[in-house]
């Protein structure tokens, strides 16, 4: 079979990916010419770097449970990148509205709604989020008893979804709260993404936008995250055994994970120790003198 080779093919793919991340849907589906592309960058990029908006789904505790990115869906089912995200001058009124740019969509501003797996969450009227109107109070289109979308879906932060708010803020407003803003990037509709960790849920992030860094007492504790998961589960029983039995310290050392061992070697060593222990118990049982019944 003949092998096809294209000179510079990988470079062309990288250039197109960069073009799509910068332009987004602003070209209307027709690629800009090189001259139009350069003119677009001269016009839009300075405005985008200066007036970037950070969008997050925030819990009542102040944690950003979800940092919105270009592909994050809105209540209207359209992506964040399909909403208005670039402003020549930021509006003075708050909250900032980011209307949907898709034709005939009545969405007046981006509104994040979480998913339950891959499906929309349900309202208290038992209908899904995409069965509600995207305008006004988000009333249900399938029934008349629903006055507006209201879901008791529980977020990973243990707070219900209806207590969260979609927050749109500027770089200065975010810095004033001590939250990360990342580097200035030319890409469209970056929202609240500031790094790879932004893809994680808020309760899993260790920066100021999430749960925060662990305390010093946690990092210095003997059962810290450097321990093996087996030790983290059985640390207290091992600790009690070390005090109650003379050979407890030997057992504790045997249970410790050696950094050079991989997982299979670790559990194999534990398995061999258990076999030796069973053989020793069996040998001691067989070595006991038989009991004789005297008349």
Swiss-Prot record:
InterPro entries according to UniProt: Fam221a/b (IPR026755)
**Region (Disordered) residue spans:** 272-295
Coiled coil regions, renumbered to chain? none
The residue ranges flagged as biased composition, category Basic and acidic residues, are 272-283
Q: Which domain of life is it from?
A: Eukaryota
Output the Pfam families linked to this UniProt entry.
FAM221
Q: Which family does it belong to?
A: Belongs to the FAM221 family.
**What protein does this entry describe?**
Protein FAM221A
Q: Which organism is it from?
A: Xenopus tropicalis
The gene that this protein is the product of is fam221a
């Amino acid at each position: 079979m003949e092998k096809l080779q294209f000179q510079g093919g990988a470079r062309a793919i990288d250039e197109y990916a960069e073009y799509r991340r910068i332009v987004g849907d602003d070209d209307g589906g027709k690629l800009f010419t090189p001259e139009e592309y350069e003119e677009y960058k001269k016009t839009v990029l300075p405005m985008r770097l200066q007036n970037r908006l950070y969008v997050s789904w925030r819990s009542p505790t102040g944690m950003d449970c979800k940092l919105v990115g270009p592909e994050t869906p809105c209540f209207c089912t359209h992506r964040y990148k399909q909403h208005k995200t670039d402003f020549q001058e930021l509006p003075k009124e708050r909250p900032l509205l980011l209307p949907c740019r898709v034709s005939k969509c009545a969405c007046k501003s981006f509104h994040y709604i979480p998913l339950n797996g891959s499906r929309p969450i349900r309202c208290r009227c038992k209908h899904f989020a995409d069965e509600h109107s995207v305008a006004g109070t988000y009333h249900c289109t399938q029934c008349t008893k629903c006055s507006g979308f209201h879901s008791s879906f529980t977020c990973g932060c243990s707070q219900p979804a209806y207590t969260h708010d979609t927050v749109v803020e500027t770089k200065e407003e975010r810095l004033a709260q001590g939250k990360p803003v990342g580097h200035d990037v030319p890409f469209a509709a970056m929202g609240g993404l500031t790094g790879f960790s932004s893809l994680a849920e808020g309760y899993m992030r260790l920066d100021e936008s999430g749960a925060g860094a662990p305390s010093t007492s946690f990092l210095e504790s003997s059962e810290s995250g450097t321990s093996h998961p087996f030790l983290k589960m059985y640390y207290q029983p091992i600790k009690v055994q070390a005090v109650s039995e003379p050979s407890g310290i030997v057992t504790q050392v045997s249970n410790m994970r050696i950094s050079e061992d991989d997982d299979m070697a670790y559990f194999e060593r534990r398995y061999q120790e258990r076999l030796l222990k069973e053989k020793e118990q069996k040998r001691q049982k067989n070595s006991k003198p038989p009991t004789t019944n005297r008349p």
